[in-house]
Amino acid sequence: MTAAVQSPTVNTTLNYFREVADGGLSEIRHGTVGSTRMKYNTQPVVVNDIRSNEGEFSLDKQGFQLVTSATKVKAFDEKTVKEQYYEELIDLIKETTGASFVLPMNHLVRQQLWESIHEIPADADDAAIVDTTAAPAMSVHIDQTPEGAELILQMLMQADAGRLGKTRWGIINAWRPLKLIRREPLAVCDVRSVPDSDLRVLGVIYPLPDGMVYNGSSDLKSDTWNVAANPEHKWYYASNMTPDEVLLLKMYDTKLDGRARKCPHSAFKRSYDEGPARESIETRCLVFWEDQERE
């Protein structure tokens, strides 16, 4: 079978936030059937391929950056990722950003079809548990609001949060294919094309691991951003990404000097997508520049 010829632009649709007045949600419980039933405002968009001009895009300018960085890791099980892969990412992010301290927080290995988590019986209870993290995330979002990012800092750094929080810090996601991407690639939006008026807070309730309590609760409520549709948004992706490449996305940055501080993103479908489920690993990292002022 001959592979489809890829165009420098892709006409597709993205799932934007549906306003609450139109049936959307303002809060979900992560990992439940109810969260998979969230309704969106699906809109046509054009996604531009950055191949041949990758160097024009950076974390501080558009909010994302493609870097070439082969990994020595062969197996992406929990133990190997935390003991070996995290160390590679720490070095990569320090080298790319000039950060002095990088702390990988968690990671998601995605290797299921998006359809698999949506083939749920209509009579299933909204509160029933379902794994929603193993498939591509097919909605436009930013992982943390500033308040959500501050909550993560306080939770993970605890006694050091006060000291580190006085310097410049942020959150960066590192997205790497585990195999050549043939379907549902990741789209990223130039944040300069996204006014704050397009951002919508979505509260997410996360059940904490067994035995863990935060502020007296076994649940953690944090805020993320969903994004309302706007034809002015500028969308991009890197075609045919390989395991030797990493797409860095900025989720938060304390600097208020005009640089990019966030990056809306979403997986998307193309008419010529083919093959088995996409395989990727996404790692979320706290990043600190201890030699720079917070703002």
Swiss-Prot record:
An individual GO BP term: terpenoid biosynthetic process
Molecular functions per Gene Ontology: oxidoreductase activity
Enzyme class: oxidoreductase
EC number assigned by the record: 1.-.-.-
Function: Hydroxylase/desaturase; part of the gene cluster that mediates the biosynthesis of enfumafungin, a glycosylated fernene-type triterpenoid with potent antifungal activity, mediated by its interaction with beta-1,3-glucan synthase and the fungal cell wall. The pathway begins with the terpene cyclase-glycosyl transferase fusion protein that most likely uses 2,3-oxidosqualene as substrate and catalyzes glycosylation immediately after cyclization.
Family: Belongs to the asaB hydroxylase/desaturase family.
Protein name from the UniProt record: Hydroxylase/desaturase efuI
